[in-house]
């Protein structure tokens, strides 16, 4: 898999990131290098290899999962430039 210059420019536009033509060309080669490495990783045979979460064997500490609102809504939106009924109000950015 590889990406072309048009794809990089399209993704930058969707992410609302200003990218010059020179930067887009550089990013195209960097992204293609990363994708090439990922393709190499997919070729590695990992049959029989147990997934690893840490290099040190340890058990995760667990706690009871309790649902709570924290009663901090007013404190959280206190410094927001614009809020409505304890919700952040932000300008529309998605077309």
From Swiss-Prot:
Top-rank taxon, per record: Bacteria
Signal sequence annotation: none
Any GO molecular function: glutaminyl-tRNA synthase (glutamine-hydrolyzing) activity
BP terms from Gene Ontology: glutaminyl-tRNAGln biosynthesis via transamidation; regulation of translational fidelity; translation
Keyword terms of this UniProt record: ATP-binding, Ligase, Nucleotide-binding, Protein biosynthesis
InterPro entries, alphabetized: Asp/Glu-ADT_sf_sub_c, GatC
EC number: 6.3.5.-
Main enzyme class: ligase
Reactions this protein catalyses: L-glutamyl-tRNA(Gln) + L-glutamine + ATP + H2O = L-glutaminyl-tRNA(Gln) + L-glutamate + ADP + phosphate + H(+); L-aspartyl-tRNA(Asn) + L-glutamine + ATP + H2O = L-asparaginyl-tRNA(Asn) + L-glutamate + ADP + phosphate + 2 H(+)
Matching PANTHER family: GLUTAMYL-TRNA(GLN) AMIDOTRANSFERASE SUBUNIT C, MITOCHONDRIAL
Role description: Allows the formation of correctly charged Asn-tRNA(Asn) or Gln-tRNA(Gln) through the transamidation of misacylated Asp-tRNA(Asn) or Glu-tRNA(Gln) in organisms which lack either or both of asparaginyl-tRNA or glutaminyl-tRNA synthetases. The reaction takes place in the presence of glutamine and ATP through an activated phospho-Asp-tRNA(Asn) or phospho-Glu-tRNA(Gln).
Family, as annotated: Belongs to the GatC family.
Quaternary structure note: Heterotrimer of A, B and C subunits.
Listed name of the protein: Aspartyl/glutamyl-tRNA(Asn/Gln) amidotransferase subunit C
Species classification: Bacteria, Pseudomonadati, Pseudomonadota, Alphaproteobacteria, Hyphomicrobiales
